[in-house]
UniProtKB/Swiss-Prot annotation:
Catalytic activity: (S)-2,3,4,5-tetrahydrodipicolinate + NAD(+) + H2O = (2S,4S)-4-hydroxy-2,3,4,5-tetrahydrodipicolinate + NADH + H(+); (S)-2,3,4,5-tetrahydrodipicolinate + NADP(+) + H2O = (2S,4S)-4-hydroxy-2,3,4,5-tetrahydrodipicolinate + NADPH + H(+)
Classification via InterPro entries: DapB_C, DapB_N, DapB_N_CS, DHDPR_bac, NAD(P)-bd_dom_sf
Localization per Swiss-Prot or TrEMBL: Cytoplasm
HAMAP family associated with the record: DapB
UniProt function note: Catalyzes the conversion of 4-hydroxy-tetrahydrodipicolinate (HTPA) to tetrahydrodipicolinate.
Chief localisation class: cytoplasm
Biological processes annotated in GO: diaminopimelate biosynthetic process; lysine biosynthetic process via diaminopimelate
Protein's UniProt name: 4-hydroxy-tetrahydrodipicolinate reductase
This protein's pathway: Amino-acid biosynthesis; L-lysine biosynthesis via DAP pathway; (S)-tetrahydrodipicolinate from L-aspartate: step 4/4
Residues at which NADP(+) binds: 36
Organism field: Mannheimia succiniciproducens (strain KCTC 0769BP / MBEL55E)
Residues that hold (S)-2,3,4,5-tetrahydrodipicolinate according to the record: 157, 166-167
Length: 270
């Protein structure tokens, strides 16, 4: 049976890429597309929004009215909207691919609670390459982490509203966990003025916002006399969209639980 997917935030940059990815993938189809209430895009054809021509699927604003048209929601929007979508999924037995970043601790707790009743993949980044980088960072941290200064540099387009990026924070979490550190204690998110000497246990973050940068992340493991850099650069949002569709196919066989792309890609067995 073909898996039917719904895209929320269908008119956004990521939403349009997701529509394209769904249409190009095998075994799935676009069941519904949504925008926020009052959007000028309500009633527009989802295919035309994505540059694919008419698909006969009109952008809607009420998930409940369209709930019989899809099995899984893909959500790359903003925390306040995503929390409402999570409630909908729990109440209506729908599964969720969640790519929204910028959740506070309460939001993350709500996601975990919802996963006790439905199946959710929650990842800061759906790129296969980035998730491979997470594993490489763990390996590098084991070898060099206690003897080097660790810095994470990320760059994104001017429209991104949260900083550091969710991916950069995930990188920091993977490193901190490997080293037995707490990112809330050891993370350094800004430097200005007289900061004093750097602590060896610091995990530093630097953020760039400029033009149309899709997403770039570089992690330094810097020791005296040498530096190892692990980088990932995305040139198209399609890498994230294709990963999200891949995650949706994988999630179709799950009933409840909170998963990430490590589970989807079976990276724990590397």
């Amino acid at each position: 049976m073909t898996l039917k997917l719904a895209i929320v935030g269908a008119g956004g940059r990521m939403g349009r890429q997701l529509i394209q990815a769904v249409q190009a993938a095998e075994g799935v189809e676009l069941g519904a597309a949504f925008e926020r209430k009052g959007s000028s895009l309500i009633g527009a054809d989802a295919g035309e929004l994505a540059g694919l021509g008419e698909l006969g699927i009109k952008v809607a604003e009420d998930l409940a009215a369209e709930k019989d048209k899809f099995d899984i929601i893909i959500d790359f929007t903003r925390p306040e909207g995503s929390l409402e979508h999570i409630k909908f999924c729990v109440a209506n037995n729908k599964k969720l691919i969640l790519g929204t970043t910028g959740f506070d601790d309460a939001g993350k707790q709500a996601i975990g609670k919802a996963a006790e009743k439905t199946a959710i993949v929650f990842a800061s980044n759906y790129s296969v390459g980035v998730n491979l980088v997470f594993k490489l960072l763990e390996k590098a941290a084991k070898v060099m982490g206690d003897y080097s200064d660790i810095e994470i540099i990320e760059a994104h387009h001017r429209h991104k509203v949260d900083a550091p990026s969710g991916t950069a924070l995930s990188m920091g979490e993977h490193i901190a966990k490997t080293l037995g550190r707490d990112l809330k204690v050891n993370g350094v998110f800004s430097r200005e003025g007289i900061t004093g000497e750097r602590k060896r246990t610091d995990i530093g973050f630097s953020t760039i916002r400029a033009a149309d940068v899709v997403g770039e992340h570089t992690v330094w493991f810097a020791d005296i006399g040498e530096r190892v850099e692990i980088s990932h650069k995305a040139s198209s949002r399609m890498t994230f969209a294709n990963g999200a569709v891949r995650a949706a196919k994988w999630l179709a066989n799950k009933q409840i639980g909170l998963f990430d792309m490590t589970d989807v890609l079976d990276l724990n067995n590397l």
